[in-house]
């Protein structure tokens, strides 16, 4: 970026500032997507030791093809991430690799959605992979810490043939594992084997028959191409949530029961199809510090290939009867954002007229910019924390071929102006008013056209 000193029109001198650097494995977001340097699909969120831990699958650019010859989902390992505030995320690195799975095919790239639970001080990480014997299986890796290191057991769980494991630790003292298209079975106390008293049934696929352990919890429910079951318990009810293809792409649906193994009664949608026709969605639901959250994925960093997905978060609410209110995806997300950080207003709460575009179409991880095309265009970014001390300056990373004036609103309202800066420039200007505490930030264009803003900050 070009470093220059510019003069703010009608105001004091404006100066360039240096962006604050973070360790490579730490990122500050608070907005969606929450991880901005790699793909993080199928996010399973769990609370351990007062922190949120997220165990996603790890999409990479496709290295395998589907049976129809098209590029396909490719996942070779698992990372684990943690956060204490849903804004600052730490990547603890790879915990399981496909080539380290004793029973798995080392080049299958089929490490789909995982899960992790804790029992008696041990952390049990459940993951699918393609078996060397063919077909999918679910393995277990065990650690003394959610961040690892994990020891992979030499054999998968006998009796499970599928992907997307989810383990429910129920109030009846038992643990239940769900997988595939909603199948469920009870686990032994050791958390690594299916219990001996699970029911068995013969399942038919066309001319083929197979004896399966457990029960099909989606029996009789809307479940076309269902996958990714996630089960949890709340206020005496068991919830089985799952993605399925209602028309052409996936929705997130749910059913309720008084018994962890069902039968379940269908209740409706948690989230409708993605507006951009991203084919899949996959999720988890967790209570953290008294608030329920929905973790899910979208292809925000891969608009041209919907098999590279990124984790996002929204707040989730229950009705008095225990049913779930439908969740709308947002760009603002849920994390608290400090005004002293780089505030990416392209992750807006509301927009009028302005456009959101990628900063670099050769590297989508660089994020987005907000383009104020004409006077009157505006964006609002909700819940920005200005702290206890009113900032004296506003910093903008902007690009503009003409001088511009903006109206800034955050509890109070004032205007700032800057000259043309045809290259990306960080401009520091006097804050036009004093404000403190939690405010909704609105930025509107007063004069100028095609003004591009990467981020704003206050100090």
What residue spans do the PLM features occupy?
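Sec-dependent signal peptide recognition
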Residues: 2-8
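Generic cytosolic/nucleocytoplasmic N-terminal low-complexity/intrinsically disordered segments
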Residues: 1-2, 173
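Carbohydrate-active catalytic/glycan-binding domains of CAZyme proteins
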Residues: 16-459
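Hydrophobic h-region of N-terminal signal peptides that target proteins for export
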Residues: 9-17
């Amino acid at each position: 970026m070009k470093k220059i000193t510019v003069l703010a029109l009608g105001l004091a001198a404006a100066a360039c500032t240096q962006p604050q650097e973070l360790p490579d494995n730490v990122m500050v977001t608070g907005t969606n997507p929450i991880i901005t340097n790699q793909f993080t699909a199928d996010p399973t969120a769990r609370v351990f030791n007062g922190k949120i831990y997220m165990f996603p699958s790890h999409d990479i650019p496709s290295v395998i093809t589907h049976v129809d010859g098209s590029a396909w989902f490719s996942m070779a390992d698992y990372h684990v991430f943690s956060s204490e505030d849903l804004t600052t995320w730490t990547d603890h690195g790879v915990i399981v690799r496909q080539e380290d799975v004793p029973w798995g095919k080392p080049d299958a790239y089929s490490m789909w959605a995982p899960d992790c639970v804790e029992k008696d001080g041990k952390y049990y990480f459940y993951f699918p992979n393609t078996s060397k014997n063919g077909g999918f299986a679910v393995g277990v890796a065990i650690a003394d810490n959610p961040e690892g290191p994990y020891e992979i057991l030499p054999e998968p769980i006998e009796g499970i043939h599928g992907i997307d494991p989810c383990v429910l630790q129920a109030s009846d003292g038992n643990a239940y594992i769900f997988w595939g298209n909603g199948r469920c079975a009870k686990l032994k106390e050791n958390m690594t084997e299916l219990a001996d008293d699970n029911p068995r049934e013969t399942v038919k696929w066309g001319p083929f028959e197979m004896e399966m352990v457990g029960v099909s919890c989606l029996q009789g429910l809307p479940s076309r191409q269902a996958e990714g079951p996630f089960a949890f318990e709340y206020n005496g009810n068991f919830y089985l949530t799952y993605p399925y293809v209602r028309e052409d792409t996936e929705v997130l649906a749910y059913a309720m029961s008084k018994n962890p193994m069902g039968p379940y009664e269908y209740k409706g949608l948690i989230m409708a199809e993605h507006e951009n026709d991203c084919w899949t969605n996959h999720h988890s639901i967790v209570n953290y510090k008294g608030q329920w959250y929905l973790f899910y994925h979208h292809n925000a960093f891969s608009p041209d290939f919907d098999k590279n997905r990124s984790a996002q978060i929204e707040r989730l609410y229950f009705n008095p009867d225990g049913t779930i209110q439908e969740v709308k995806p947002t760009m603002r997300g849920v994390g608290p954002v400090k005004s002293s950080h780089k505030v990416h207003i392209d992750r807006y709460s509301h927009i009028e007229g302005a456009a959101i575009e990628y900063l670099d179409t050769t590297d989508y991880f660089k994020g987005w910019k907000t383009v104020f095309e004409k006077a009157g265009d505006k964006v609002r970014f909700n819940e920005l924390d200005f702290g206890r001390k009113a900032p004296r300056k506003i910093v903008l990373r902007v690009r503009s071929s003409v001088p511009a004036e903006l109206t800034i609103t955050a509890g109070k309202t004032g205007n700032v102006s800057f000259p043309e800066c045809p290259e990306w420039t960080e401009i520091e200007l006097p804050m036009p008013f004093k404000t403190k505490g939690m405010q909704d930030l609105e930025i509107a264009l007063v004069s100028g056209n095609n003004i591009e803003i990467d981020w704003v900050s206050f100090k």
